[in-house]
Amino acid sequence: MNKIKIYLDTSVISYLDQQDAPERMKETQEIWELFKEGKYEVYISDVVVYEINQCSREKRETLLDYLDQIEYNIIETDEGTVELAEKFIDFGFLKRKSYDDCRHIAAAILAGCDFIISWNFKHIVNVKTIRGIKAITTYEGYKDLMIYPPSALLEEEEEDYGSDDKRT
């Protein structure tokens, strides 16, 4: 059986060590365990690598150490990624100032990912962006890309494997 392909934007990796958001940090760490177990096929792009490299030395080293814990594929963005990212702006559901977010989404679509997970509710995980992405993928003939916060993976795991809830 093929594993679900999941694209991680930088916010997911960053929240592994986000002391000022303990609940999201805990959820992200739980999801990271699933990645370490190899339950999903994980993707990041060179945009993620670039954004991590913009962090302070200490934060950058911490995030790279986390990445070393899992298997992942790196998507190299190219002209096709840029063209698709530009369409998101042209269609008006993302703005030019969110260009890197557009590139994350475009990279995930072009790599054939099933999901992109992100803690970025302002630009990625919101109704306007999700509807816009659906319109573009349908119009351009790409596979649908589902966009969720990382916590949705925990909910899926509970459904797949049952919970500890013993209600009858």
Task: List the predicted regions and their residue ranges.
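Short, well-structured N-terminal submotif of metal-dependent ribonuclease cores
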Residues: M1-I44, N53-D65, D90-R96, I130-I133, ...
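Short, catalytically relevant binding-site loops at active-site mouths
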Residues: V48-E51, G80-V82
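Generic structural signal for residues in well-ordered beta-strands
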Residues: V42, I74-I75, I147
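C-terminal end-helix/capping segment
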Residues: V125, T129-M146
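Active-site neighborhoods of divalent-metal-dependent phosphate/nucleic-acid chemistry enzymes
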Residues: I74-R131, L154
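Short secondary-structure boundary segments
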Residues: T10, D46, W119-F121
